[in-house]
């Protein structure tokens, strides 16, 4: 019983729990302690009831009971869980995406061939967004959709007068070359000139014979066609000088003589 006295002399509460757990196994033990047959996992084992004669299964069972009691008695001794910080969603910008190592990249789609132009790698998303805005304004002008439209009307900010230029010099030179090529293609693709889009107006003057067209270009075009046609020689033999075109111009009609029968003249001829 020396082992039992040692546990009783200790004031640790867990040791008292251990003694309570060992009570079924520490019955009256003496020099002639009886033996009994114990079946563990289907095997017959003959063991003594002394404290120093516990089987491994009994020791494991006692440890489980002690762990359960410790969790019930002292729950505050366990470390408190630390809540994770709520990760706020990063604001997304047009033409900007993040690499898995944390850097931000910017790229823009060209208007003609729909390919992407690499604008560079940046430390912050805002800097990458500014690089995209600068490239978009150079390519599309006032029609560009920007991440920061409030800077559009600031003097020199997107026009190149600002000292802040997030684009690399090589990227900026490539962008300028693309802009020049786009301007050339736009000049070539013009469908027609301004004179063809807006033809000269024709004016009409009112007269007693109706409305007369006073388009100078029409007269010049008609005279040019007559002179250039192979049948223009025929018109030279026609003489309209004696006709009645003097009063009403080239658009008048000559008066024909009356076709009524003059009976007075016929009667005079018959009398004579």
Curated annotation (Swiss-Prot):
Q: What is this protein called?
A: Ethylene-responsive transcription factor ERF060
DNA-binding region extent = 92-149
The record, for Gene3D superfamilies, names: AP2/ERF domain
**Location(s), subcellular:** Nucleus
Record-level GO BP terms: ethylene-activated signaling pathway
Q: Name one Pfam family in it.
A: AP2
Could you tell me the keywords of this UniProt record? Activator, DNA-binding, Ethylene signaling pathway, Nucleus, Transcription, Transcription regulation
What are the protein's GO molecular function terms? Answer: DNA-binding transcription factor activity; transcription cis-regulatory region binding
Please provide, in alphabetical order, the Gene Ontology terms of the cellular component aspect for this entry: nucleus
What does the similarity note say? Belongs to the AP2/ERF transcription factor family. ERF subfamily.
The domain of life for this entry's organism is: Eukaryota
InterPro entries (alphabetical): AP2/ERF_dom, AP2/ERF_dom_sf, DNA-bd_dom_sf, ERF/AP2-like
Which SMART domains does the annotation name?
AP2
What's this chain's function? Probably acts as a transcriptional activator. Binds to the GCC-box pathogenesis-related promoter element. May be involved in the regulation of gene expression by stress factors and by components of stress signal transduction pathways.
């Amino acid at each position: 019983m020396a082992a039992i006295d040692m546990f009783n002399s200790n004031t640790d509460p867990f040791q008292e729990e251990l003694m309570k757990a060992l009570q079924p196994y520490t019955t009256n033990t003496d020099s002639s302690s009886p033996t009994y047959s114990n079946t563990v996992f289907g095997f017959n084992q003959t063991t003594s009831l002394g404290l120093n004669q516990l089987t491994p299964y009994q020791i494991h069972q006692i440890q489980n009971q002690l762990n359960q009691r410790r969790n019930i008695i002292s729950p505050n001794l366990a470390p408190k869980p630390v809540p994770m910080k709520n990760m706020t969603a990063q604001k997304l910008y047009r033409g900007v995406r993040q690499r898995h190592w944390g850097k931000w990249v910017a790229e823009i789609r060209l208007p003609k061939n729909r390919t992407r132009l690499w604008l560079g790698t940046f430390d912050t998303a805002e800097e990458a967004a500014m690089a995209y805005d600068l490239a978009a304004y150079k390519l599309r002008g006032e029609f560009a959709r920007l991440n920061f439209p409030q800077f559009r009307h600031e003097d020199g900010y997107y026009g190149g007068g600002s000292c802040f230029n997030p684009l690399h010099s090589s990227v900026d030179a490539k962008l300028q070359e693309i802009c020049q090529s786009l301007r050339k293609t736009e000049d070539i693709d013009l469908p027609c000139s301004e004179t063809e889009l807006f033809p000269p107006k024709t004016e009409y003057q009112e007269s007693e014979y109706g409305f007369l067209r006073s388009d100078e270009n029409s007269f010049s075009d008609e005279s040019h066609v007559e002179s250039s046609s192979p049948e223009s020689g025929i018109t030279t033999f026609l003489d309209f000088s004696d006709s009645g075109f003097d009063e009403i111009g080239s658009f008048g009609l000559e008066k024909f003589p009356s076709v009524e029968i003059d009976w007075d003249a016929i009667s005079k001829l018959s009398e004579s």
